[in-house]
């Protein structure tokens, strides 16, 4: 049986290698240069901007290998102030290309690079190629040695969504992962992290949001048990404003979110609104000043203003390498909410993975 599993995994890895080769095949000469990175830096903020970096580092994986690519990516994000807030998003895509090497070298890699973005991407890709049982057996060890297993487990949720399991099936899978950590000090954070990752993973695909209102998404979250429901529901609120074509559409969605939380109050609902603000007005598209203005406009309309502020600050810090420093600047750019903003920022744990960052080298 063990030998058969070995052959199965080997076959899957070979298939992935062939697929990756087909996608990345190009000139035999190196396509990498500082000129190409400069083009990415000058690209218009948005999908073209992030896709440019994804292509660059995916190509580097093919030409220079996994370790060099990840080291260069890590160093570059530090040097360029987080690639204008898109670090976590790009790291997801990079992790998808590296997953088999990532798992083979996981003990040598700092998963906090871009707020666990690389490991989340690796998990998402692994879910496509491994059976649910093999997936759990293989990847739970990756979180065991992680500095913050709860954030790591969040990536399990993303992967479950990518595997297209139902809410009920996701509940069962998250339950199994929760059981693995039930005796750990940090267990309180694990259940919601898994269910939240799942719901966010669903919303990574624009078509998922096309025919769903917030109430429908909220009801679907009730498939999760009590410990996991809030994580799913918060993520539903958070992602509801994604993929809006203009400010008017975003305004309508955000007001709907605010009214929904007033009518269906559950723990962390207004924190979901704050996190949704960071989704609707992401750091790689708008200035700190613009985010501060949006925080004042929308958080002021909620029933729990400080919780809303905390959600925005927390998401910004999580999604970027330099988010904590920029969150301080955001607080200083507010007028009406400056005191509450400073207070909320001061309560964010000093152990936040990106409060301090250092370049990680794989040896």
Label for each model-derived stretch:
Residues 1-13:
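N-terminal Sec-pathway targeting helices
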Residues 10-22:
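Hydrophobic membrane-insertion alpha-helices, especially the h-region
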Residues 22-363:
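Non-catalytic tandem-repeat scaffold regions and their flanking low-complexity/translocation tails
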């Amino acid at each position: 049986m063990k030998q058969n599993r070995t052959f199965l995994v080997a076959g899957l890895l070979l298939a992935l290698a062939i697929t990756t080769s087909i996608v990345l095949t190009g000139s035999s000469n190196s396509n990498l240069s500082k000129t190409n990175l400069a083009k990415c830096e000058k690209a218009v903020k948005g999908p073209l901007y992030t896709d440019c970096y994804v292509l660059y580092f995916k190509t580097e994986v093919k030409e220079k290998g996994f370790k060099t690519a990840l080291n260069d990516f890590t160093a570059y994000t530090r040097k360029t102030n987080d690639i204008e807030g898109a670090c976590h998003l790009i790291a997801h895509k990079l992790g998808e290309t590296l997953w088999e090497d990532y798992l083979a070298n996981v003990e040598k890699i700092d998963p906090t690079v871009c707020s666990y973005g690389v490991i989340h991407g690796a998990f998402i890709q692994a879910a496509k190629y491994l059976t649910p049982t093999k997936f759990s057996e293989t990847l739970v060890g990756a979180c065991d040695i992680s500095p913050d297993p709860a954030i790591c487990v969040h990536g399990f949720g993303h992967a479950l969504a990518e595997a297209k399991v139902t809410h009920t099936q996701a509940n069962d899978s998250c339950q199994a992962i929760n059981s693995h950590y039930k005796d750990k000090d940090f267990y309180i954070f694990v259940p919601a992290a898994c269910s939240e990752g799942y719901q966010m993973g669903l919303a990574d695909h624009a078509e998922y949001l096309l025919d769903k209102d917030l109430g429908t998404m909220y009801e679907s979250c009730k498939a999760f048990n009590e410990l996991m429901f809030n994580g799913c529901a918060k993520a539903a609120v958070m992602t509801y404003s994604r993929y809006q074509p203009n400010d008017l559409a975003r305004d309508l969605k955000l007001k709907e979110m605010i009214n929904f939380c007033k009518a269906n109050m559950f723990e962390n609902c207004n924190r979901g609104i704050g996190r949704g603000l960071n989704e609707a007005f992401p750091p790689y598209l708008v200035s700190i000043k613009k985010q501060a203005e949006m925080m004042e406009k929308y958080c002021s309309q909620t029933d729990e203003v400080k919780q809303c502020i905390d959600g925005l600050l927390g998401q910004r810090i999580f999604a970027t390498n330099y988010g904590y420093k920029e969150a301080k600047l955001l607080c200083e750019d507010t007028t009406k909410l400056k005191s509450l903003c400073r207070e909320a920022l001061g309560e964010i744990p000093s152990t936040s993975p990106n409060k301090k960052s250092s370049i990680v080298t794989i040896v």
